Design a protein with these regions (language model features):
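Second-shell loop/turn segments in exported
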Residues: 58-65, 86-93, 119-120, 151-152, ...
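Extracytoplasmic/secreted cell-surface and envelope-processing proteins
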Residues: 42-43, 99-102, 126-129, 186-189, ...
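Metal-dependent phosphoester-hydrolase catalytic domains
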Residues: 208-219, 227-364
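N-terminal, active-site-proximal structural segment of metallo-dependent hydrolase catalytic domains
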Residues: 23-114, 118-130, 200, 328-332, ...
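Structural recognition of the beta-strand scaffold that forms the well-ordered cores
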Residues: 31-34, 88-93, 116-118, 131-134, ...
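Bacterial Sec-dependent N-terminal signal peptides
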Residues: 1-27
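Metal-dependent phosphoester/phosphodiester hydrolase catalytic core
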Residues: 48, 159, 169-201, 205, ...
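Structured beta-strand-rich core segments of catalytic domains in phosphoester-bond hydrolases
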Residues: 37, 95-183
Length: 364
């Protein structure tokens, strides 16, 4: 039965991809962006989730005007992050539902960028999901699925599902993307780490399942992991390690030496592991920066001889001046948030986005 389902899946994917015209030849850049957009809710009550704070008469007085302003702000960030052109694909965290995504893509300057989207519809108690935006001329969508995190201790616990999207890039190769928002640190980092370990374990199984179908897959993992690259969930369970120095995209990273018998095709590389960053993180809490938002790639995308590969030095936290404000409680700057506690600031998000570039060689 498993073999039949696998063959059927591959045949359907190939059929969908044949419906699209061929890409133009030459070289092309492919920018990836990941952004936790801080509570992108609509103004309607969902009786199945705890969204009462984000209603016109809720604690945060979330109105249609504030929603419209936030959508314009997010469109500005996505456009600016693309620099010369908007990112080819964008992963979003903390999105309530389809309604806000449709408005983002139709009621802002993004409406001319030909984005389409898919998203999860999970059972998170807060009612937030993850989403994936893609430009149709740069990514040929073939399908998507969402996967719940398998908790080992609290089987009844609910969090954001992991979104798996697959399709074809301009080289004609398949790209598998996972968009994640791991369980939060609410209640304490140590007290909550088991949930993130379970999420990392689920994600690793999903990556391994893709590898079982393809010996050298192009895998891209993006999102807010609520852990840093050095935490056990990322380093020891997901096994996402720093890039070897010869392929490193992070200035100052240390060389990584693998045992001779290591199967490099199974490795995942965290583009934000090791090295020095400016700013020193994507999220700031009580004066401390943490790199909670990350981009992780399979070894095939780190190989500069591949027809799709990482542009060395391109992975970074996107931090233009308009996304930052002076931190009055602590030193330096912090992200310009929509809310600071229950106080409305009218900013963008409590996270900064992360981006990375890939080079595509489109042959005849």
């Amino acid at each position: 039965m498993t073999k039949i389902l696998t063959v059927t899946f591959l045949v359907l994917t190939l059929f969908i991809l044949t419906l699209f015209p061929a890409y133009p030849q030459g070289q092309a850049d492919f920018r990836v962006m990941s952004y936790n957009v801080e509570n992108l809710f609509d103004t309607d009550d969902d009786p199945l989730t705890a969204d009462n704070d984000f209603l016109p008469d809720g604690n945060r007085h979330w109105t249609g005007g504030r929603l419209y302003h936030k959508l314009q702000q997010l469109a500005k960030v996505i456009t600016a992050a693309g620099e010369w052109s908007t990112p080819a694909v964008v992963g979003l965290c903390e999105v309530e539902n389809d309604s806000v995504l449709v408005r983002l893509l139709r009621s802002t300057p993004l409406r001319g960028q030909h984005y389409r989207y898919c998203m999860t519809h999970g059972e998170d108690t807060r009612g937030i999901n993850v989403a994936f935006l893609y430009q149709r001329d740069k990514f040929r969508y073939a399908g998507h699925a969402e996967h719940p995190v398998r908790f080992t201790r609290k089987s009844h616990k609910r969090t954001r599902n992991i979104l798996h999207v697959w399709g074809e890039v301009m080289t004609g190769e398949r790209l598998d993307v996972f968009v994640c928002h791991f369980p939060s640190r609410y209640g304490g980092e140590k007290e909550s780490e088991a949930g993130r370990a379970d999420a990392a374990r689920t994600l690793r199984l999903l990556c391994d399942s893709v590898h079982a179908l393809c010996p050298s897959p192009h895998i891209l993992v993006i999102g807010d992991f609520n852990d840093t690259p050095d935490n056990a969930s990322m380093r020891d369970i997901l096994h996402a390690r720093p890039l070897p120095a010869v392929r490193s995209s992070v200035p100052g990273s240390m060389p990584v030496r693998f045992p001779p018998d290591t199967d490099l095709s199974l490795l995942l590389y965290n583009l934000f592991a090791g090295g020095r960053h400016n700013p020193p993180g994507s999220h700031k809490y009580q004066g401390e920066w943490s790199q909670l938002d990350q981009i992780i790639i399979s070894s095939s995308l780190a190989d500069t001889t591949s027809s799709m590969h990482l542009v060395p030095g391109s992975a970074r936290t996107f931090s233009p001046p308009f996304l930052l404000v002076r931190d009055k409680s602590w030193r330096g700057e912090r992200p310009f948030r929509t809310y600071y506690g229950f106080k409305y600031e009218g900013g963008y998000s409590d996270h900064l986005p992360v981006i990375a570039d890939f080079r595509l060689s489109v042959g005849p």
